């Protein structure tokens, strides 16, 4: 199993400030998969309190991987736009409680969409 890897990734995510900020991808030469570095949190399912930033940043990492692999700069630009939207949202406290904001998961996602549309 990867139990110790899971434990270490959770601990390092906490050092970074929140499990909700630990982005990752599993990548090979042909395929990649975006996922937040931490496990599921069934105890908060459906409560609108989960931090979506780790999954959004994981998607950004996947876009970068694909853009580099295929030589497609527009995918890398999309990745940068996602990362910039997350950075700006955190600075404006448009985030969930674990990041110092007062928004729920849905509202945080909507704030990111507004920043991407601007």
Set out the residue ranges of the language-model regions.
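Glycine-rich phosphate/nucleotide-binding loop
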Residues: 1-81, 85-92
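Glycine-rich phosphate/pyrophosphate-binding loop and the adjoining helix
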Residues: 72-77, 81-118
């Amino acid at each position: 199993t990867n139990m110790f890897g899971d434990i270490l990734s959770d601990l390092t995510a906490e050092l970074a400030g929140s499990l909700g900020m630990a982005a990752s991808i599993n990548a090979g030469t042909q395929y990649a998969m975006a996922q937040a570095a931490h496990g599921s949190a069934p105890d908060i399912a459906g409560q609108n309190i989960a931090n979506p930033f780790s999954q959004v940043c994981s998607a950004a990492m996947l876009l970068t991987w694909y853009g580099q692999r295929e030589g497609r700069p527009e995918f890398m630009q999309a990745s940068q736009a996602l990362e910039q939207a997350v950075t700006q949202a955190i600075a404006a406290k448009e985030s969930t409680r674990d990041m110092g904001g007062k928004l729920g998961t849905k509202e945080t996602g909507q704030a990111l969409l507004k920043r991407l549309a601007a």
